[in-house]
């Protein structure tokens, strides 16, 4: 009975969520688009001409938002965007116009090589401007296990960013407050000159979800 009450409560909140309604009106696949939108408006992350990689992209609302920002440029002509968005996820994703999607686990060498190849082609052999990660583990409710899974996914995004970002590039990852949160923030501070924590209004109040932004890579010793 308690589980049914919880499900009915979640469904009621979801149906009446203003961000869900806005996403439906504006054609976004998920309300998560407005989390990125708010952070982008505050921090000016996405600009015309950029090459952007979206890790854990499905169902695709972050890729949609990034694509729309790159399309909103005087240099975006003939239906093309000014820049490139490369998205990857374990799960399938319906195509997003102008977004290159790879389905697979980028921890696997063959998938990682494909991702690198697509990114190099999109960037003209240069490094990239922005890495977005909305990756999240399946949470078990066991605090220490969940903390380890969250930290692991943040580490994957951080390692990818270190290898592929321009020195002036940025990394935005989803995280959750918990026992490993401060360690993740410290890792960002070791690798980026500017680190900020963001909790957009579109994140549900009851959620421990937060976002960590790193900008301007530090030189490797």
Swiss-Prot record:
Task: State its location(s).
Answer: Cytoplasm
Location, primary (coarse class): cytoplasm
**Superkingdom per UniProt:** Bacteria
Q: Which GO terms describe its molecular function?
A: rRNA (uridine-2'-O-)-methyltransferase activity
Q: What is its EC number?
A: 2.1.1.166
Active site at 174
Q: Which residues bind S-adenosyl-L-methionine?
A: 60, 62, 89, 105, 134
Q: What class of enzyme is it?
A: transferase
A cellular component annotation (GO) from this entry: cytoplasm
Q: Which UniProt key words apply to this protein?
A: Cytoplasm, Methyltransferase, rRNA processing, S-adenosyl-L-methionine, Transferase
Q: Which reaction does it catalyse?
A: uridine(2552) in 23S rRNA + S-adenosyl-L-methionine = 2'-O-methyluridine(2552) in 23S rRNA + S-adenosyl-L-homocysteine + H(+)
InterPro entries hit by this protein: RNA_methyltr_RlmE, RNA_MeTrfase_FtsJ_dom, rRNA-MeTfrase_E, SAM-dependent_MTases_sf
**Pfam families from the entry?**
FtsJ
Q: Which PANTHER family match?
A: RIBOSOMAL RNA METHYLTRANSFERASE (PTHR10920), RRNA METHYLTRANSFERASE 2, MITOCHONDRIAL (PTHR10920:SF18)
Q: Which family does it belong to?
A: Belongs to the class I-like SAM-binding methyltransferase superfamily. RNA methyltransferase RlmE family.
Say what the protein does.
Specifically methylates the uridine in position 2552 of 23S rRNA at the 2'-O position of the ribose in the fully assembled 50S ribosomal subunit.
- Name of the protein this chain belongs to: Ribosomal RNA large subunit methyltransferase E
